[in-house]
Amino acid sequence: MLPTYFGTSNFLAAFAVWMGVVVLAFAIFCVRRLYFHPYSKYPGPLLGKLTNYYAVYHSWKGDQHIDMWRCHEKYGPYVRYGPNELSINTAAGLKEIYSHGRNFKKSVKYNAMVHQAANTLTTIDKRKHGKKRRLISQAFSDAAFRSYEETIQQKIAQLCTALRRRDDDSNEIVPDGNWGPAKNMSHWCDWFTFDVMCSVIFGVPWSSLTEKTYRNVPHLIEVSNVRVGCLIEAGGSKNMKIDKYLFPAAIAARNQFVKFVNDIIRQGMAMSAKGSLKGAFALLRDATDPETQEPLSFKELCGESATLVVAGTDTTSTALAASIYYLCNHPKVYERAVQEVRSTFQSRAEIGLGPKVNSCTYLRAVIEESMRLSPSAPGPLWRQADAGGATVDGQYIPQGLEAGTCVYAIQHHPEIYPQPFKFVPERWLGPEAVPEQYRSDYSPFAGFTPFSIGPRGCIGKPLAYIELTLTLCHILYAFDMRLPQGVNVNEDAEYQLALHITAAKEGPLVEFRPRTVV
């Protein structure tokens, strides 16, 4: 009940004034963002011009990469996708945003990914990032890669054994020449790449390919990424803390993953005390900055290790599953890749790093085209213009505003990749090998950025190619493979991904027939 001195009419009048002020403020806010903003001249979705929550919504749905591609199809090469975000879908723009020496730094959005300490992926300051990258690169040198090969080969052997099993709960092996039951390759690729990264980084003895103890960890990463992807597009701030009410399952998954990382680091430190620690963790623990002679702190060491596990599991797993998907849906491509591998190697023992693997150029083209159509991180990597602003493909980006290129959109650009939704490995074999209808004035690498480019490009890119090439060589040599009986090949289909920082996926279901090989 209102006090007698505050009558109903006065209350309604005050409420009307208050509402009028709110409406006026909102109108001014909208007018400023739509007509008096440095990005006002650029087309884009209306809600995107007004609020970041347009991007948050599509991040939550997992279709932000598709939506950005559609926006570029509708509006052209320059799209205002957020109030302060300009998406640039040109080969020149890609180079000018991300290459060395550009006046950009990582967006503050990346703060949403920081948990305990900033790592190489999330560090915004260029000088600090340079220090971290110099340290991390010591675990990703050519010599380090050679030392990891034995571990990778062991994991590939375990994967091939798993593909021969009748089912996951028995040791019954499918006889040579017989087709086995369908395998969900999104799961097996996740477990395989997760095992590789944990073994390469920490030298752990267990295997998700043979045991179920840690098989939920890749799923925890996927669930956790839904929340973080939304926080990134919201602007990178976690100060409001409303995410704990919106994403309780994602936070629980994050906490479980952090516990896993802490446990495995403790195992690594225990092995270190015994002098038996191997892998990248040992190299990172002992590494010092060549310029400052400073090592990584313990928190930094934990952060870098966790990031390597996450990035190395998700991205390589998606590329491997996508390659298998496209091979199974394109019989002529499959036959050519099989012929190349089986004519190159006379035994499984010959499949290793060196000239023979490097000579499998068609298989490499299959991998490249698979990553073009279904990139592991298909979204935009936002960059913020530094002091003085920057010019990108003729467009001025004022200081503090952001620009980026959506990986999925640029890798489906019809001028760079004619008939961009067609799976054509020949695009990567040189101009003379490309059928006329798929030829372009651009190099296929002009828009190819599954690992990003420039000083922030993925440091694990060579390791990913090693895993992908060796694994596919072994699978194509040791097995025939096909889609399950009753499932028709579809050469026009694309391996579908959901974007939550990296790509979430399902399938393909594939049947394997072991060959009698040495």
UniProtKB/Swiss-Prot annotation:
Its cofactor is heme. GO terms for biological process: secondary metabolite biosynthetic process. Disruption phenotype: Abolishes the production of aspercryptin. InterPro entries: Cyt_P450 (IPR001128), Cyt_P450_CS (IPR017972), Cyt_P450_E_grp-I (IPR002401), Cyt_P450_sf (IPR036396), Cytochrome_P450_monoxygenase (IPR050121). SUPFAM superfamilies: Cytochrome P450. Gene3D superfamilies: Cytochrome P450 (1.10.630.10). The keyword Transmembrane applies. Glycans are attached at N184. It is a single-pass membrane protein. Heme binds at C458. GO terms for cellular component: membrane. Its EC number is 1.-.-.-. The chain crosses the membrane at residues 11-31. One of its GO terms (molecular function) is heme binding. Induction: Expression is positively regulated by the aspercryptin cluser-specific transcription factor atnN. Keywords: Glycoprotein, Heme, Iron, Membrane, Metal-binding, Monooxygenase, Oxidoreductase, Transmembrane, Transmembrane helix. Pathway: Secondary metabolite biosynthesis. It is found in: Membrane. It comes from the Eukaryota. Cytochrome P450 monooxygenase; part of the gene cluster that mediates the biosynthesis of aspercryptins, linear lipopeptides built from six amino acids including 2 highly unusual and nonproteogenic amino acids, 2-amino-octanoic acid (2aoa) and 2-amino-dodecanol (2adol). The core structure of aspercryptins is as follows: Ser/Ala-Thr-Ile/Val-2aoa-Asn-2adol. The first step of aspercryptin biosynthesis is the generation of the fatty acid precursors, octanoic and dodecanoic acids, by the FAS subunits atnF and atnM. Belongs to the cytochrome P450 family. This is Cytochrome P450 monooxygenase atnE. It comes from Emericella nidulans (strain FGSC A4 / ATCC 38163 / CBS 112.46 / NRRL 194 / M139) (Aspergillus nidulans).
